[in-house]
Amino acid sequence: MTRPVRTRFAPSPTGFIHLGNIRSALYPWAFARKMKGTFVLRIEDTDVERSSQEAVDAILEGMQWLGLDFDEGPIYQMQRMDRYREVLAQMLEKGLAYPCYMSAEELDALRERQREAGLKPRYDGTWRPEPGKVLPEPPAGVKPVLRFRNPLTGTVVWDDAVKGRVEISNEELDDLVIARPDGTPIYNFCVVVDDMDMGITHVIRGDDHVNNTPRQINILNALGGEPPVYAHLPTVLNEQGEKMSKRHGAMSVMAYRDAGFLPEAVVNYLARLGWSHGDAEIFSREQFVEWFDLEHLGKSPAQYDHSKLSWLNAHYIKEADNARLAELAKPFLDALGIDDAAIATGPALDAVVGLMKDRATTVKEIAEGAAMFYRVPAPDADALAQHVTDAVRPALADLAAALKAADWTKEAVSAALKATLATHKLKMPQLAMPVRLLVAGTTHTPSIDAVLVLFGRDVVVTRIEAALA
């Protein structure tokens, strides 16, 4: 194919968008970028009753968050109705389509008779014009549907980039309805006109569209268009092995942001959810674009693994800039009741994030760990009774005195802790646990010397001495 590469993502705005959906945007985006082509966003909103602006906004927001920028669009099918009607009129004029007056009840009865006879249920061509055929008289007051005049013989063939060579006999296909009685065009027809008008060269989409493909190819051929390369992606399964869907508990794309995942981690994970480059597990967006090809798309369903995504997210959090993570952590801190004013009273959030990020798998976890630096500690009474004993109080008093005089560095604080341990013949947990409780309000913190340095000398000494008073 010598045409410039043009790919598209064509979601229906009828609900939220999950990882399985957005993967059908990631791959055509990457292929367009790899081939220096054009990536088109098309909103297939002909299902007026189920489509919503809220769903469109969710699609746009999810793509923006993941950095899936489009070159053209969004193009809305509902804004192209005049074009569809123009093509329908041309097809009627050329005999490529015809009016069919068979009612839904008649069609149901026909299919039932076919099933009883052991035949495949299908439209029987009652209203299809043929040389020498006398058509029934159109019933009064009935508006017809329009049907595409599908070839009666021959085979539809395409070389699918994922499934290989696919052949479907035209005898298996009946004459597809392409417009409703009110003249509204049907999805399969609109898709063909759009792909033809937009010069789409590669259609990379879920394999739930495979059954539509032979019909779309026949319509495209009838209109004189050039069929694109098709790549039908296997289904994404959830952790229970079911098709990923909202009904089966799938999270929306933006729910991952709201849970504290980084977009680069989600993109990296999605890239590997149906495509591979050798054994590479971790790679940048730029590497993904450079390496991406259709030949290495998986042929089997890919199963979502939340622990794998969390592992990747932890990696990207460790690599991320502290200032960026601090900004991302602020909404989570705010949800914990810690606003900018509270943050201003404590240690620099960048530094706190730098300490917490090595232990976190999400930004939310960073915020939960950072919260202790911006709150008045309220340790559990039972924990205090367990750890702040009469036996350890003299050591706490000596430590407070040593910290008053020490240089305020991690090394000096560590030395003061070790000296106190030696003097009082204690092990580190016997001293570190009560210090953590009194200063931070919890026994779960990173390295005690690093934590104390961030709290600051005044806070640390004041809180220890207050407990001993």
UniProtKB/Swiss-Prot annotation:
GO terms for molecular function: ATP binding; glutamate-tRNA ligase activity; tRNA binding; zinc ion binding. Signal peptide: none annotated. Its EC number is 6.1.1.17. InterPro entries: aa-tRNA-synth_I_cd-bd, aa-tRNA-synth_I_codon-bd_sub2, aa-tRNA-synth_I_CS, aa_tRNA-synth_I_cd-bd_sf, Glu-tRNA-ligase_bac/mito, Glu-tRNA-synth_I_codon-bd_sub1, Glu/Gln-tRNA-synth, Glu/Gln-tRNA-synth_Ib_cat-dom. ATP binds at residue 246. It comes from the Bacteria. One of its GO terms (cellular component) is cytosol. A motif ('KMSKS' region) lies at residues 243-247. It catalyses: tRNA(Glu) + L-glutamate + ATP = L-glutamyl-tRNA(Glu) + AMP + diphosphate. A motif ('HIGH' region) lies at residues 11-21. Monomer. Belongs to the class-I aminoacyl-tRNA synthetase family. Glutamate--tRNA ligase type 1 subfamily. PANTHER family: GLUTAMATE--TRNA LIGASE, GLUTAMATE--TRNA LIGASE, MITOCHONDRIAL-RELATED. This is Glutamate--tRNA ligase. It comes from Burkholderia cenocepacia (strain HI2424).
